[in-house]
Amino acid sequence: MVSKLSPLQQELLNALLNSGVTKEDLIQALDDMIPSPSFGVKLENLHMSPEHESDNKPVFHTLTNGHHHKGKLSGDEGSEDGDDFDTPPILKELQSLNTEEAAEQRAEVDRMLSEDPWRAAKMIKGYMQQHNIPQREVVDITGLNQSHLSQHLNKGTPMKTQKRAALYTWYVRKQREIVIQFNQTVQGSGNITGKSSQDQLLFLFPEFNQQNPVPGQPDDSCSEPANKKMRRNRFKWGPASQHILYQAYERQKNPSKEEREALVEECNRAECIQRGVSPSKAHGLGSNLVTEVRVYNWFANRRKEEAFRQKLAMDAYSTGPSHPHNLNSLLSHGSPHHTQPSTSPPSKLQGMRYNQQGNNEVTSSSTISHHGNNAMVHSQSVLQQVSPVGLDHSHSMLSPDGKLISVSGGGLPPVSTLTNIHNLSQSVHHNHQQSQNLIMAPISGVMAITQNLNTSQAQSVPVINSVAGSLAALQSVQFSQQLHSPHHQQIMQQSSGHMAQQPFMATVTQLQNSHMYAHKHEPPQYSHTSRFPSAMVVTDTSSISTLSNMSSSKQCPLQAW
């Protein structure tokens, strides 16, 4: 005969035999330790009621006596709930009944106690899921700890026999209760039709079990305290009904009343089939009965959830890229870039970057590269400025100290950042009038200004004039008509129309990208092109004479006011 013991068990048994314990002692010890078919309680130790014989499974007599709970019963090993557990009222109630039905229930409970606790727990859990029974109902009736009950049903955590007897008693009685509920005919239901019938059935059945007790049971039930009222079970959608409703939601998100009533019949039929009863007994669903109002609320909740998810998605999208924190982002989102073809490295391309840093410094760097006979001017103005919140109207974006920019063999880079950031908060009308008249003139044009101030063809055009820290003041200066060549007029018309729609700071890049400062392949029309190439300058009217008297030393002092 092959031994069923594992190697570890054989080793332990050999150690016991080698320790001097005889075979008879081991058998006697095993008889004392192993629970008997009477569930660990010896028959001679039981206090039997006089009306019951020893063949009536006396487990309830043992469990209902408080002084016998100290015995080690099956299923007690490893129980984490160490609190003393008084005899549940449901056990006392069942023990006090002398009817044939009560005897059958006790026999069923004893049979379940003799089986594997984990198998019984899985059976009870499946039954609760099939009928949508919440654990709260079991806790209210049996007095068990909900955490311990959940662990026992889901993980097979050991539970004391007395507690398992209370759980099994509830399970046996619930089975009979549901059978009676489906077979019971509601009195007076023939006078109620339509939705009102379903609503009354909904509120009638939770109390139906207490108003119509099982025959043979006493009216004053001791299963619950006299002053404690049983709560009505909350409605819970079953998996069968949810499957039907989600399919209907894909077809129609807002069904009509007729469609909802058809869904009610379909859901109740599915719930009955799930419970293993005929669809004609849908009234026995009790608190789980599906009504038209519940279907309407289910669709309304799904529509609200979908609208809420869409709103969250839109908010997440709108708060992402639409709030730039630097000028580069503002320019990239404000207008498309039209870059000029160039063979210079990317680091030398024209651009502007506005960084929010702690220092109020403005640096400008210019790199000029020559390719053949054409001199390309590449400038990069890096603005390191504090956040606009920290600025006031007395601050300017350029440092107050003057700087000299030495240029050899080329023109000056365009000065396109002379503006006050606080002028962006002015009225739209005022900005519209200013931005339509803003221009920047090349140095050769300034030379022409000094020579043609008294010509008859001159017209008054405002030029940016920076005076005493205010960089937004405009002053009219007589410009010569020859400044406005056809090429310049077309550019100024485009720039004026664009600046009328957007703030000036966002227009700077548009003016740069419109080839206004690019090298012109057409012959220049100014008189001093050999001295000053077509570089742009923003100057004060008091400095025009100084610029006109400059020599050809290729070093042009440009003071940042």
UniProtKB/Swiss-Prot annotation:
Record-given protein name: Hepatocyte nuclear factor 1-beta
Disulfide bonds: none
Biased composition (Low complexity): 332-347
Origin superkingdom: Eukaryota
UniProt-listed GO biological process terms: endocrine pancreas development; genitalia development; insulin secretion; kidney development; liver development; positive regulation of DNA-templated transcription; regulation of transcription by RNA polymerase II
The entry's keywords: Activator, DNA-binding, Homeobox, Nucleus, Transcription, Transcription regulation
Tissue specificity remark: Expressed at high level in kidney, liver and intestine. At lower level in lung and testis. Not found in heart, spleen and muscle.
Amino acid composition bias (Acidic residues), ranges on this chain: 77-86
Biased composition (Polar residues): 319-331, 353-372
Sequence segments annotated as region (Dimerization): 1-31
Region span, Disordered: 49-87, 319-372
InterPro entries cross-referenced by the UniProt entry: HD, HNF-1, HNF-1_N, HNF-1_POU, HNF1_dimer_N_dom_sf, HNF1b_C, HNF_P1, Homeodomain-like_sf
Main subcellular location: nucleus
Subcellular location: Nucleus
